[in-house]
Amino acid sequence: MGIPTRTGARLAALATMLLALASPFAAAATLRIGMSDDPDTLDPAVSGSFISLQITSVMCDKLIETDPQLTPIPGLATAWHWSADDLALTLSLRTGAAFQNGEPFDAAAVKWNLDRYRSSPMSKRASQLKPIKDVTALDDHTVRIDLSEPYAPLITMLADRSGMMLAPLATMAAGESAGAHPVCLGPYEFVRRVPQERVVLRRAEHYWDPSKLRLDEVQFVDIPDATLRLTNLQAGQLDLIERVAPTDLDTLRGDPHLKLAATPALGYQLIIFNLAHGPQSDSPIGRDPRVREAFEASIDRDTINQVVFAGQYIPDNQPESVGGPYFDPDHPVPHRDLARAKALLEAAGQGRVGFTLLISNDPVSAQVGQVIQSMAAEAGFDVTLQMTESVSLSQAADRGAFQAAMQIWSGRTDPDQNISIWVACDGFLNRGRYCSPPLDKILGAATRTTDTALRAGLYRQAAAIYLEDRPVLFLQHYAWLWGANAKLRGFAPTPDGLIRVKGMSLAP
């Protein structure tokens, strides 16, 4: 049976690599995880891909962790409290912890990391931490974060990349190359990376809680083809695979040596448009919101879900799940309307509109692109699909070398980090350079209160703006579908899609 891969050479390379994984090097205490992509960088300050977050979450503990229900729990900060005016957050830090190279973990290290995240020219966390005015080490194990204004998402930020602690001396010595060999404070430390093949981690010698480490090694293996991931899971060459193709679920369920783990996801898929980022923004789809509206009217989210995802996902037009507290019911998921699409193009003075859609070159993304291409053609759009590696796609989008690009976001518990990142003027994933000062004002107000009802009202006001301007089109929310060796113990899928390796083991 033919298995689709990137190229014949890529398949040969994967076969060679997987034979190596089946060798004595892959001992019983080695967890081998099949991933859908290669990480961009392993420096939490710079990275923007979910695969990078997945790997760095195993290497780098955060100041605040989350439990399987995504409730904040102690991490490297054992306790925290807000000041009465919500302008200062004080953290009590864990004692007896050290970085993977032996550097001490203390308040000075926390201050250095937070200052790096919010001020380094390379940092993609700077806009997320903009409300931080100062970070002060009160003593060796107490840190105070002072804010210029109340900032509700801060706890969520410290439970994300911005809360990951890197060893200051090692990171300063590495400079811009810190992501090539990151040194964190976490359960498994970096060993090596073979680009487009794997990242290898080993049990950290200095970890503060060794009782939770039941694996000697963790390998993240890059296999973009979902069916190929499943094939290697069945062959025993992998122990856990992410993003099982919905069309492969019956095969997985029918194998007594495997098990399925599934949960609704915070993550979603979307298309971003280049509105003002370099020469490629000068196109009808970038210049005119009526053309983007016509494009949305030409596609059918339900059809995409049924054809590509076997009905397992949730069609959506917003970054929050349908029916959730921050979803705007006044703007429900629109149905396909070809007549309206054609009328909008005519009103915009356009005949047929051509543009290039940049997509990742995994088979599932290709299928989504092909379905969209076919539907949009009926309305008057000539969509050229440009397939590329996910890292190359992100790099192209960062420099404005795109007209439209398909993206994935793993989702966050705080609504600000599901929308501001894409549409705020300084959003770190606002690659199309959309900017609406009235929208920024509303989004800013929503971060300054913790009142759910008030925030929901503000995010609905925001939705009325970005759904009209359409700098992005949300397509669907995912379900996390994992395949696992039946011998794997301790794995529990969570809505954020992260693998919590601590406590996991492989039975003999």
Summary of predicted features, one role per range:
Residues H81, S92, A126-A170:
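Surface-exposed binding/hinge segments that line
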Residues R32, D106-N113, D140-D146, G186-P187, ...:
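Alpha-helical secondary-structure segments
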Residues R290-E293, N305, D382-L393, S420-A486, ...:
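Extracytoplasmic/peripheral linker and loop segments enriched in polar/acidic and small residues
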Residues P195, Y313, G324-P325, P334, ...:
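Ligand/substrate-recognition segments at binding pockets and active sites
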Residues Y151, A159-L213, E217-Q219, L338-A339, ...:
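Gly/Pro-rich hinge or "lid" segments in bacterial periplasmic/extracellular proteins
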Residues H206-T251, P289, Q373-S374, D382-T384:
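Ligand-site clamp/hinge motif
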